[in-house]
């Protein structure tokens, strides 16, 4: 998540339109009460959580998840939450953070939003 948010906020700071698409487990990063902290860190860090990686990043003086998300919010990065993912996880919209303006949509919405001259990155 850190690199996706860092890349999104950097691109938005350069006045490039950015859309972040959150689906399945990644949607939990947008739940209230820091749901991202409990997400698995990934295959390269077995047993670690997003919170563990965030502590490691901030311990090195790097921006943490909350700071990067705040930058994305400030730069008006568009956040698209997968409608199918919400249903699959049994999450209600009321469980998502109030400070993130998001739209619900799906893969078609995301692809339609991507400009012809833009780039789609999967991290």
Regions found by a protein language model. Name each.
Residues 61-112, 118:
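A charged, amphipathic interaction segment
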Residues 38-71:
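A glycine-rich helix N-cap at a beta->alpha junction
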Residues 18-25, 49-53, 110-115:
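Short C-terminal domain-edge/linker segments immediately following a structured domain
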Residues 26-39:
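N-terminal beta-loop-helix "entrance" segment that forms/cooperates
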Residues 120-123:
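Short hydrophobic/aromatic patches at helix-to-coil boundaries
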Residues 1-4, 30-33, 92:
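Short, glycine/acidic-enriched capping/hinge loops at junctions between secondary-structure elements
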Residues 36-40, 97-100:
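Short, hinge-like loop/turn segments at secondary-structure boundaries
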Residues 1-26:
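Long, hydrophobic N-terminal alpha-helical segment
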């Amino acid at each position: 998540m850190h690199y996706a948010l860092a890349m999104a906020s950097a691109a938005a700071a350069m006045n490039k339109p950015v859309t972040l698409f959150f689906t399945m487990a990644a949607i939990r990063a947008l739940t209230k009460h820091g749901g991202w902290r409990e997400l698995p860190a990934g295959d390269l860090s077995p047993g670690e959580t997003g919170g563990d990686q965030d502590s490691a990043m901030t311990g090195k003086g790097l921006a943490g998840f909350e700071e990067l998300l705040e930058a994305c919010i400030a730069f008006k990065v568009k956040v698209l939450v997968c409608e199918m993912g919400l249903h699959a996880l049994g999450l209600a919209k009321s469980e998502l953070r109030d400070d993130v303006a998001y739209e619900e949509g799906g893969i078609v919405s995301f692809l339609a939003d991507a400009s012809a001259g833009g780039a789609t990155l999967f991290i």
